[in-house]
Every structure is written in C-alpha cells, then in structure tokens.
Swiss-Prot record:
PANTHER family: BIFUNCTIONAL DTTP/UTP PYROPHOSPHATASE/METHYLTRANSFERASE PROTEIN-RELATED, BIFUNCTIONAL DTTP_UTP PYROPHOSPHATASE_METHYLTRANSFERASE PROTEIN-RELATED. Nucleoside triphosphate pyrophosphatase. May have a dual role in cell division arrest and in preventing the incorporation of modified nucleotides into cellular nucleic acids. It is an enzyme of class 3 (hydrolase). This is Nucleoside triphosphate pyrophosphatase. The active site is at residue 73. It comes from Anaplasma marginale (strain St. Maries). Pfam families: Maf (PF02545). GO terms for biological process: nucleotide metabolic process. CDD domains: Maf (cd00555). The keyword Cytoplasm applies. GO terms for molecular function: nucleoside triphosphate diphosphatase activity.
Amino acid sequence: MLKIEGLVLASSSKYRLALLEQIGVVPGEVVSPNIDESLLKGELPRRYCMRMARTKADAEAALRSDKFVLGADTVAYCGKRVLSKTESEDCAVRYLEMLSGRRHRVCTSVCLRSPGGIVHERSVVSVVKFKSMSKGEIEYYISSGQWRGKAGGYGIQGFAGALISWIQGSYSSIAGLPLHETYCLLGGYFDLKHIP
C-alpha cells in the first residue's frame, strides 16, 4: 500500500475508500464534503454526475489548496430519470420495482484536482440488468438496509449483486469508483508502478 499524504478523498463512501485501497492507494485524509446535491432543472444524468464529482473536489480543494483532491459521484438512471440516493424504504421499493427485469445505466464520475488547480475528469457509464425480482426478494433486500444512501436504491457489493443478471461495463465503477480510470489519473502525479 502507498499512503499518499498529499491526497484527499472527498467522499463519505466507505466503498470508495475500499476500492481505492484495491489499487494500493491510501489517501492521507478522507472527508465528507458538505455540498448541495440537488439536480438542476433539465440536467442530464451524466452531466449531473460529473458536476457532483467536480463540486466535491472543488469544495475540499478550497479548504486544502496544497493537496490533491479526488472527488467521485455515482448516479443510477433509467432514460433521463436520475434515481437519486435513497433515504426511505418507500423510495427504495419503488426503485427496485421499477428496475426489476429491466436494464438501466450507472455513471460514476471522478475528478482529480491538483494543488495548482489543474482538473482531470473521467466518467464511466455501465449497463446493469436486474432479474425479475419477486416481492419476497425485494422485501428481503429492503429488510437488509443495504439500500440506504445508495444511488438507485442498491449497492452491487451486497445482496443486490445476487439479483443482477448481467452488467456491461465496469464493476468497480458501478460499485462507486472506476479503478482503471482512477489509477491512470493518480498515476499522472504519483509513482504507482511499484504497487504489486
């Protein structure tokens, strides 16, 4: 593992930190940015996702101008409809019923801001298809509490992974951090080649 003292992860997601550790990187600091995550009128899902990643990085860079700041955001969406982070059981049930037997997209955007103010951004869009879920499967998933705070009402890392028929794209991106793209962004500034 390479602990990078000059790197701040601007995310409240424990999964993002664990994913970052999978590529051998431990940030010097992990912070939960306090930002407005409201969707703008007419804003498309991918643009919204990138704006959120950039806003997280910008908010923390303003407080830590001498550090590299990595912000990320994940958005699930059907068509142009953003399936926001779920905070209520009713919302999670509605999302899962809507996603049952259907495909939808998941976008994760990453923004790396350097101490000099240089901004690097990447977005990865993947397709996810849920099996046709029974009422019992949805109820079991809801009772697990794994839907809380998750885009689209689910996290692929937990029991929901058993309900997903297939994905097209990046598993790590669906989980919250596209590892290849993040590795490439960080590798532009830090020597990551020695990490096994």
